[in-house]
Amino acid sequence: MIEKEEIGIAIENYDECISGSKTFVFNTKGGTIGSGDDCTFRIQDKLEQIKNTHAIVSYEEGSFTIAAFEDSDIYYNKSFSRMPSGYEIIISIGDIFKIGNLEFRFVDAKSIEASIKENKKYLE
């Protein structure tokens, strides 16, 4: 169970990404991951395998979860089998999932915020 009310996602192999940012922080409102303009975390890989809406991140009863949207392919924690559609998995910091050709890691949201602050300081 995650004790914070935010969770971060970082793309591990950002060189395979053609759009979007390398990191994102979800709060208790949750959101969607995909290539569509209406997604909360908008990304696309070089092979354009990421659907308009590919995954749903939710927050319920003190835990964040992830689920595949409709028939989208998500591979969780290096599994060779894709997640069943509509099946929610409780997220833990350090978990890895793959969408298209991109590999993501769930991280502490504070580490993303600290990294952003450090980069801003470097640019000034």
Please report, for each region that a protein language model flagged, where it lies by residue.
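Forkhead-associated
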Residues: V25-G100
